Curated annotation (Swiss-Prot):
Quaternary structure note: Immunoglobulins are composed of two identical heavy chains and two identical light chains; disulfide-linked.
Annotated spans, Complementarity-determining-2: 75-81
Entry-linked InterPro entries: Ig-like_dom, Ig-like_dom_sf, Ig-like_fold, Ig_V-set, IgV_Light_Chain
Source organism of this protein record: Homo sapiens
Nucleotidyltransferase keyword on record: no
Chain positions covered by the region annotation Complementarity-determining-3: 114-120
Protein name, as recorded: Immunoglobulin kappa variable 2D-30
Region (Framework-2): 60-74
């Protein structure tokens, strides 16, 4: 069964800082999916997100229709409490991916990547 819904959105962040603006770009803009099949969303940063402490502060958020956003993944690949293990995050430096191993109907929504490394 195909879900004719938008599974993700594009988020571009300009964060003023000493090393210049950080631009986050997601692709694709829209992703038709099939229940039970995998789905993948990419996120690219214009600068490395590796912080001076060695951590990479890349988060993934999900916003279901009519609901507030909730964080799914923090520091690239760590699950927040209650997040199903069909979600996984990976990547390093500037390139990151959110994968859903088996899409369920409740997964329909908008997905955002957000960096937390570079701040004004």
């Amino acid at each position: 069964m195909r879900l004719p819904a938008q599974l993700l959105g594009l988020l571009m962040l300009w964060v003023p800082g000493s090393s210049g603006d950080v631009v986050m770009t997601q692709s694709p803009l829209s992703l038709p999916v099939t229940l039970g099949q995998p789905a993948s969303i990419s996120c690219r940063s214009s600068q490395s997100l590796v912080y001076s402490d060695g951590n990479t502060y890349l988060n993934w958020f999900q916003q279901r229709p009519g609901q507030s956003p909730r964080r799914l993944i923090y520091k690239v690949s760590n699950w927040d409490s209650g997040v199903p293990d069909r979600f996984s995050g990976s990547g390093s430096g500037t390139d990151f991916t959110l994968k859903i191993s088996r899409v369920e109907a409740e997964d329909v929504g908008v997905y955002y990547c957000m960096q937390g490394t570079h701040w004004p």
